[in-house]
């Protein structure tokens, strides 16, 4: 019985140790990705002249047609 309890405790401590290691690795990766994403977001942001408001002030805005709705499929007729 004593050996079984110590092996369970050993397994539990190993599991917790691995969990802590993986959480630290995951934390460092997420901070790294946040640092990488920030400059990209700044570059993607459009300047005010390209926004809808800028186009309205600059001239007539081209009219965009709404997305066409998918045609409803005809229900198969069940003949008897």
Curated annotation (Swiss-Prot):
One biological process term in Gene Ontology: response to ethylene
Signal peptide positions (record): 1-27
Region (Disordered): 44-80
Tissue/organ expression: Mostly expressed in leaves, and, to a lower extent, in roots, stems, siliques, seeds and flowers.
Induction pattern: Induced by drought, salt stress, ethylene (ET) and salicylic acid (SA), mainly in shoots.
Location(s) in or outside the cell: Cell membrane; Secreted, Extracellular space, Apoplast; Endoplasmic reticulum; Golgi apparatus
Record keywords: Apoplast, Cell membrane, Cleavage on pair of basic residues, Endoplasmic reticulum, Golgi apparatus, Membrane, Secreted, Signal
Motif, SCOOP motif: chain positions: 62-80
UniProt keyword Secreted, yes or no: yes
Top-level taxon: Eukaryota
Function: Brassicaceae-specific phytocytokine (plant endogenous peptide released into the apoplast) perceived by MIK2 in a BAK1/SERK3 and SERK4 coreceptors-dependent manner, that modulates various physiological and antimicrobial processes including growth prevention and reactive oxygen species (ROS) response regulation.
Family that this chain belongs to: Belongs to the serine rich endogenous peptide (SCOOP) phytocytokine family.
Listed name of the protein: Secreted transmembrane peptide 3
Organism whose genome encodes this protein: Arabidopsis thaliana
Gene: STMP3
